[in-house]
A protein has these predicted regions:
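Active-site and adjacent substrate-binding regions of carbohydrate-active enzymes
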Residues: 1-554
Length: 554
């Protein structure tokens, strides 16, 4: 039997360095700060750290606008700081995964600065340029951050494409020289000892070369999972990822199961695994992110069923509730009030019981919440500020917009990590770049470590279960009680064992009936989120946000 790749039974911890730990008084996190917290991460027992971009960047989009792929931004430290962090992590058995953005570069990148204003620059064809159409933009594609996806270069009269901010110019992957540069960048970091790469919005790199107008949407159907995407990924995988033995995870925007079965194929011909976001759109009524609505629980279960069954035996998924672009999960699908701790544990158990590689976003393991900012000036996020202006222009009241941002802004997850009850949550001795959530005196890592019943130790238990029981990695997926409006229950089967996971997603009790085919079997409780959970699988009344994981012998 072939050996399971390390990442299939791993749990990965995502660090947003700007908000993790400041080693001084700058107010922004840095590499030395991460290094100072490695023992905390070792206590949690995660296998790898994914760092969001720490490359040289003007920080228009918090580092996802890279101006130099081969150097560390001075805000985070130096290359020797990075090398020291890598060595210190490896010494603790923790791998490092770097975030790489190759759909676009910053307009401050040397390639773009050479290309701008000069049609004859050797770097002009590194980007996507089009002539005006009818005296205006080349087509009606929209930027993900609002407005047209095209920006005029006045010196040449041509427009360049930017699917994100105008300071993020899209690279032209049709140009073999661009693909060669990407391979060189990956080689550079792999040679330093980096263990893996997270590829930002990687399924957007292949554009329909006709660049047609979109009569029904914002243009995304012409560049999402585009015509040459699989060819491009196989090329990079064959030439660099496979030879250096790197783990790769692709962020897939608005993708499909069929594409992800290929992106994350078990033969590793493209990537190791994929992130998809369908489950985090269940509170976008009519597809509208910028609205405030309860999440659609039945749809959440349906989506996970579709992906768990569809990827089993074909491809590998990354499992996650949170990241630096999403609100805090306990605020979103759980409870910020009296049930916060059990709700955070329930959400963790439900996700970690699934097949795939779980990702924990910094602070998730202590049940951090959205900050509940009351003023637009508290927000730093470019997307949030743009939406505020757009909604105001549409006539929406400030209170309504702030309520929406309070639920959906990317800054909800970017507030400083809450280390202790000390000033600024122990994040910095200076002025933090983003205001910490006001609840840090109660919700912080120091308090969590001291309390054996905290969310932190529940995550630690889940990580230990995944290492101890191969069924977490290997089992298939079958949903139970499909139409139940409160309970998400599923079984996973492998090697004569059955894993039963039962979760109440609401603050009211719910009656759970053990299915007849599972009755009478021997089983043991692996983990509950109340101190007196039933030891054997049985019908029971689930308490608010109660979650139970049982292992049964068939």
């Amino acid at each position: 039997m072939t050996q399971t790749p390390w990442w299939q039974s791993a749990v990965i911890y995502q660090i947003y360095p700007k908000s993790f730990q400041d080693s001084g008084a700058r107010g922004t996190g840095d590499l030395k700060g991460i290094m100072a917290r490695l023992d905390y991460l070792k206590t949690l027992d995660v296998d790898a750290l994914w760092l969001t971009p720490v490359y040289v960047s003007p920080q228009v989009d918090n580092g996802y606008d890279i101006a130099d792929y081969l150097n560390i931004d001075p805000a985070y430290g130096t290359m020797s700081d990075f090398e020291a962090l890598l060595a210190a992590a490896h010494a603790r058995g923790i791998r490092i995964v770097m975030d790489i953005v190759v759909n676009h570069t910053s307009t401050e990148h040397a390639w773009f600065k050479s290309a701008l204003g000069d049609k004859h620059s050797p770097y002009r064809d590194y980007y996507i340029w089009k002539d005006p159409v009818d005296g205006g933009v080349p087509n009606n594609w929209q930027s993900k951050f609002g407005g047209s996806a095209w920006e005029l270069d006045p010196a040449t009269g041509q427009y360049y494409l930017h699917l994100f901010a105008r300071e993020q110019a899209d690279l032209n992957w049709e140009n073999p020289a661009v693909r060669a540069e990407v391979k060189k960048i990956i080689h550079f970091w792999a040679k330093k000892g980096v263990d893996g790469f997270r590829l930002d919005v990687i399924n957007l790199i292949s554009k329909d070369q006709a660049f047609p107008d979109d009569e029904v949407g914002d243009g995304r159907r012409f560049y999402t999972d585009g015509p040459r995407i699989h060819e491009f990924l196989q090329d990079v995988s064959r030439d660099v990822f496979a030879p250096v033995g790197a783990m790769t995870v692709g962020e897939m925007s608005s993708t499909s199961l069929e594409h992800c079965q290929r992106y994350g194929a078990l033969d590793g011909s493209e990537l190791s695994m994929v992130f998809n976001f369908h489950h985090l759109k269940v509170d976008y009524p009519g597809g509208d992110k910028w609205s405030k609505a309860p999440f659609d629980f039945l749809e959440l279960k349906r989506i996970f069923n579709h992906w768990q069954c569809g990827m089993h035996g074909k491809g590998w998924s990354a499992l996650f509730w949170c990241n630096h672009d999403q609100p805090r999960i306990v605020s979103r699908f759980g409870d910020e009030g009296e049930h916060r701790v059990v709700a955070a544990k329930m959400l963790a158990s439900t996700l970690h019981g699934l097949q795939g590689t779980p990702y924990i976003y910094q602070g998730e393991e202590i049940g951090m919440t959205n900050p509940g900012y009351q003023c637009i000036n508290d927000y730093q996020d470019v997307e949030s500020r743009n939406i505020f202006a757009i909604k105001q222009a549409e006539g929406m009241s400030e209170a309504e917009i702030l309520a929406i941002l309070g639920a959906k802004s990317r800054d909800n997850s970017r507030t400083p990590m809450q280390w202790s009850a000390a000033s600024n949550a122990g994040f910095t001795s200076g002025t933090p770049w983003l205001k910490p959530a006001a609840n840090y005196p109660e919700i912080n890592a120091e308090a969590a470590l001291a309390d054996q019943h905290s969310v932190f130790w529940h995550y630690r238990d889940l990580i230990a279960l995944r290492k101890a029981h191969p069924i977490f990695t290997q089992g298939d997926y079958q949903e139970l009680l499909t139409g139940h409006p409160q309970i998400w229950a599923y079984v996973r089967r492998a090697n004569g064992q059955t894993l039963l996971v039962v979760s109440n997603f609401y603050g009211e009790p719910a009656a759970f009936e053990l299915p007849a085919e599972l009755a009478g079997g021997k089983g043991q409780l692996l983990l509950g989120n109340y101190p007196d959970s039933p030891a054997r699988p049985q019908s029971c009344k689930l308490r608010p946000y109660e979650s139970l994981i049982w292992l049964m012998e068939q």
